[in-house]
Amino acid sequence: MSEIRLYVSTTESQAEQILDLLTEVFGEEDFAIGTTEVDEKRDIWEASVYMMAEDEAQVRSRVETALKSAFPDAQLLREVIPDVDWVVKSLEGLKPVRAGRFLVHGSHDREKVRPGDIAIEIDAGQAFGTGHHGTTAGCLEVIDRVVRSRRVRNALDLGTGSGVLAIAVRKLKNMPVLATDIDPIATRVAAENVRRNGIASGIVTRTAPGFHSTAFSEHGPFDLIIANILARPLIRMAPQLAAHLAPGGSVILSGILAAQRWKVIAAYSGARLRHVRTIWRNGWVTIHFDRP
């Protein structure tokens, strides 16, 4: 069944106001909500809500009712989202993805790497994370900022999947990285991708559910912790994750729907971390915290 995007094309300021309105309307329901910049020079942004086709009628009715009272001149537009599974899609269909200075590409696109690119080679396979999903791309952008601007001597990639984020950290800076996942297939795939990218000596991969492994005490505490999983486990693990963060360290979290962001921020603020920034990509958010 197709996914539908209902959106309003407007200015950045109004897009953020509409986003707040949509968040109030849908609360903790599983509808992705977000804003996207379309044209920087002309200040064109889109505020969007995503749903499956079967939910469109009721979502449209609720959005139109909310807009009518708060933004009567707003025009609600519609787009059908192509049904694409990037993990199992054929290699020929996967285009290189740029996120900050990173270029994530498959083995079939090596010739597209340009001078100055930080290239990460990941082929589609059994483990999630090829750079095409908004959560992965958002993490890559924040990783680039954090490693460039802060003192980072070691890192943890929790829920590593394909290993793309661990590889990104290691390619930015020569430091030890621990990459863990609950799924042994993902751990094996991550190790293979680490070797493929020529940095096997700098990344340790381990199969571990949550923080239940001696690897965390052996390699931590960490100056940087990245966890691109889901909002509920992130909220549940907030105290444990914060306990493994070194003084002055940074945390990058994703796998979070826009409507879920406030609960995640509250959980990590409660763990005495400071919210630094939130970035948006296609209805998903990536949140950066630090320990003051």
Swiss-Prot record:
Q: List the disulfide bonds.
A: none
The protein's job, in short, is: Methylates ribosomal protein L11.
A biological-process GO annotation: methylation
Q: Under the cellular component aspect of Gene Ontology, which terms does the record hold? A: cytoplasm
What family classification does the UniProt entry report for this protein?
Belongs to the methyltransferase superfamily. PrmA family.
The record's listing under PANTHER family reads:
ELECTRON TRANSFER FLAVOPROTEIN BETA SUBUNIT LYSINE METHYLTRANSFERASE (PTHR43648:SF1)
Key words of the record: Cytoplasm, Methyltransferase, S-adenosyl-L-methionine, Transferase
Known EC number: 2.1.1.-
State the InterPro entries in the record: Ribosomal_L11_MeTrfase_PrmA, Ribosomal_PrmA_MeTrfase, SAM-dependent_MTases_sf
Transmembrane stretches, start-end: none
**Full protein name:** Ribosomal protein L11 methyltransferase
GO MF annotation: an example: protein-lysine N-methyltransferase activity
The listed locations are: Cytoplasm
- Native organism is Rhizobium etli (strain ATCC 51251 / DSM 11541 / JCM 21823 / NBRC 15573 / CFN 42)
* Domain of life of the source: Bacteria
Gene3D superfamilies on file: Vaccinia Virus protein VP39
Q: Which reaction does it catalyse?
A: L-lysyl-[protein] + 3 S-adenosyl-L-methionine = N(6),N(6),N(6)-trimethyl-L-lysyl-[protein] + 3 S-adenosyl-L-homocysteine + 3 H(+)
